[in-house]
Amino acid sequence: MAHKISSDDRSGGTTNLEWILDNWIELGADPAKLNLGLAAYGRSFKLNDPNSHGYRAPCTETWNGSGKHSGAAGRFTREAGYLAYYEICEKLQNGWTEVWLDEGKVPYAHGDGDWVGYDNIKSINYKVDMAKTYGLGGLMWWTTAIDDFNVSLVQLDDVILNLFQGYILWAGEISIDDCSKKQLA
């Protein structure tokens, strides 16, 4: 989920993380009882036009059983529209392009006619800082089950340990390997 982006106004500005947190708190929720979820996967879509790949680019919508996600299935996850973070890293190493959407503080990637939205280390750091700023009760990571714990580009358990250690100790940036440093077998 992105942070506030000007094009969110098309949906009444209610689809970004800040609005959601502000709304819960305004309605009386205790921030210390709210947890922020972080994703170790991305949702992908088939672009209508591979040359038009920006934020909210037109995509083919196909119901795959868990939502309208029409991107190609991952090599390991094998579900259309669902890519584990290590599969996204593999695609980036094989020619996909990562784009940082500064306004939303999130990345997306595109290649082979597909588009995927996901979190990377930079966006996760930003969300951890946001959780600290709002005084949230904690963080939740979904899911370690999609890490292969053997050949992945980024061992997600390392990310999780650094993430939670940093949150608990109010430490600085998460420090781990990025996608460019390891290869899938």
Which residues does each PLM region occupy?
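Structured segments of extracytoplasmic/periplasmic soluble domains
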Residues: 20-27, 127-134, 183
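Hydrophobic, secondary-structure "cap" segments at the distal end of domains
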Residues: 69-135
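Substrate-binding surface in catalytic domains of secreted glycosidases
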Residues: 1-83
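Active-site rim elements
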Residues: 5-12, 21-22, 111-121, 140-145
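Conserved beta-strand elements of beta-rich interaction domains across eukaryotes
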Residues: 41, 123, 146-147
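Stable alpha-helical elements in mature extracytoplasmic
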Residues: 13-20, 120, 124-127, 153, ...
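Aromatic-rich peripheral "rim/lid" segments of glycoside hydrolase catalytic domains that contact
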Residues: 88-91, 130, 145-185
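Conserved, mostly hydrophobic/aromatic
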Residues: 36, 131, 139
